[in-house]
From Swiss-Prot:
Homotrimer. It comes from the Eukaryota. It catalyses: NH4(+)(in) = NH4(+)(out); methylamine(out) = methylamine(in); CO2(out) = CO2(in). N-glycosylated. Residues 31-61, 108-125, 175-179, 241-251, 307, 362-396 are extracellular. This is Ammonium transporter Rh type C. Ammonium transporter involved in the maintenance of acid-base homeostasis. Transports ammonium and its related derivative methylammonium across the plasma membrane of epithelial cells likely contributing to renal transepithelial ammonia transport and ammonia metabolism. Postulated to primarily mediate an electroneutral bidirectional transport of NH3 ammonia species according to a mechanism that implies interaction of an NH4(+) ion with acidic residues of the pore entry followed by dissociation of NH4(+) into NH3 and H(+). It is a multi-pass membrane protein. Keywords: Ammonia transport, Cell membrane, Glycoprotein, Membrane, Transmembrane, Transmembrane helix, Transport.
Length: 460
């Protein structure tokens, strides 16, 4: 089997075909939300709204800006740590996110915002589409450097579809609370990506080992991504919460958890090195685990000290995962996790689901007040049998559903991506920008071996 990485026809045709389909589907199904439509003046009068500043745009757009930066800048630059894969890390993240948000607007729209035959599109839809793509960016981290852009587009197509179905099951059928997406975004995205990379296992990947590492400047670029993600994560976890106390509380809980996570990550990184030195991999990734783990319970009455405890624990677990678990997964289970998403998103996502279930199960009127409890968990007159323990049970069920959807979906998509005609690189040519990008002349001399697009992997 020839390893032909020439994408001259495959990539343009795939991009153009997908975009034409998006144009047609948007033309048929998508219309503006009343808050974005030119009839807003009449809508405002009908709803007795006195000012344009009460438009939903002004409540949600600041959070949308922050989330948007996280998806395109934060995730993109976080993955630039590979010394010869910076163009692809940022560029392919840009590509899959740009396609993913369009398909997510349609998939989530059909499931959540379909009225009178149309999807009504407002600023909250844009935030939710970014959330969906965030899950794809998480999965991208597992296969980084080992797949072609065509494979990434196909993976995005299927993952967005599966994400939207999983999200509908959790939020609409099980009615779980998951403001920051610990279960829907991080757990689903991580275990979907890990399953895909398990199916795409490369036995000769050691031949690219010298490129599967960082250099001084690539780690600095990755740290830029870390800082953007760390600063904006409170917006991420609070972006779609109810206005008022819930959104305020979600930002505070995330802020506290992230802060605690940094100190424990630094402590463990130093303690686990025989000379007490820090590892940039831990500082770039484990310091963010607190934001992941507090996501489900972000808008609940977790209390600031509870958020600090969550961040404290996740900093330890994530750092230990990078040191001990990632090598074990690769050597024993054949899971080649390029970015260590299991440590940043997988395990913290599961912890977040558990924390959310426990916090929901312990909710009471003393903590929330009668009206506050009803508002926090959307209890109305139809939910006469609702109890906190029941909510906790549904929260736990949501975690298992996310895991099941991720594993089954990852198996199916992994098999599809394993087909030989997607333009994937040979094992010895992984983690190399020159395969798919025109690179500066002064960098071409650094390529350690021939990048023949028909090159086959060397037999062991």
């Amino acid at each position: 089997m020839a390893w032909n990485t020439n994408l001259r026809w495959r990539l343009p045709l795939t991009c153009l075909l997908l975009q034409v389909i998006m144009v047609i589907l948007f033309g048929v199904f998508v219309r503006y939300d009343p808050d974005a439509d030119a009839h807003w003046i009449d809508e405002r009068l009908g709803r007795n709204i006195s000012s344009d500043m009460d438009n939903e745009f002004y409540y949600r757009y600041p959070s949308f800006q922050d989330v948007h930066v996280m998806i395109f800048v934060g995730f993109g630059f976080l993955m630039t740590f590979l010394q010869r894969y910076g163009f692809s890390s940022v560029g392919f993240n840009f590509l899959l996110a740009a396609f993913g948000i369009q398909w997510a607007l349609l998939m989530q729209g059909w499931l959540h915002s379909f009225h009178s035959g149309y999807i009504v599109l407002g600023v909250e839809n844009l935030i939710n589409a970014d959330f969906c793509v965030g899950s794809v960016c998480v999965a991208f981290g597992a296969v980084l450097g080992k797949v072609s852009p065509v494979q990434l587009l196909i993976m995005t197509l299927f993952q967005v579809t599966l994400f939207s179905v999983n999200e509908f099951i959790l939020l609409n059928l099980l009615e779980v609370k998951d403001a920051g997406g610990s279960m829907t975004i991080h757990t689903f995205g991580a275990y979907f990506g890990l399953t895909v990379t398990w199916i795409l296992y490369r036995p000769n990947l050691y031949q690219s080992k010298e490129r599967q590492s960082s250099v001084y400047h690539s780690d600095l670029f990755a740290m830029i991504g870390t800082l953007f993600l760390w600063m904006y994560w409170p917006s991420f976890n609070s972006a779609v919460s109810h206005h008022g106390d819930a959104q305020h509380r979600a930002a505070i809980n995330t802020y506290c958890s992230l802060a605690a996570c940094v100190l424990t990550s630094v402590a463990l990184s130093s303690a686990l090195h025989k000379k007490g030195k820090l590892d940039m991999v831990h500082i770039q990734n484990a310091t963010l685990a607190g934001g992941v783990a507090v996501g489900t319970a972000a808008e609940m009455m977790l209390m600031p000290y509870g958020s600090l405890i969550v961040g404290f624990i996740c900093g330890i677990i994530s750092t230990l995962g990078f040191v001990y678990l990632t090598p074990f997964l690769e050597s024993r289970l054949r899971i080649q996790d390029t970015c260590g998403i299991h440590n940043l998103h997988g395990m913290p996502g599961i912890i977040g689901g558990i924390v959310g279930a426990v916090t929901a199960a312990s909710a009471n009127t003393q903590q929330y007040g009668q009206k506050g409890l009803a508002h926090a968990f959307d209890i109305d007159a139809t939910k006469t049998t609702w109890t906190a323990s029941m909510q906790g049970s549904f929260q736990a069920a949501g975690l298992f559903v996310s895991l099941a959807m991720a594993l089954v979906g990852g198996l199916i998509v992994g098999v599809i991506l394993k087909l030989p005609f997607w333009g994937q690189p040979a094992d010895e040519n992984c983690f190399e920008d020159a395969i798919y990008w025109e690179i500066p002349e002064d960098q071409k001399s650094l390529v350690s071996r021939s990048e023949d697009p028909t090159l086959r992997p060397t037999e062991p």
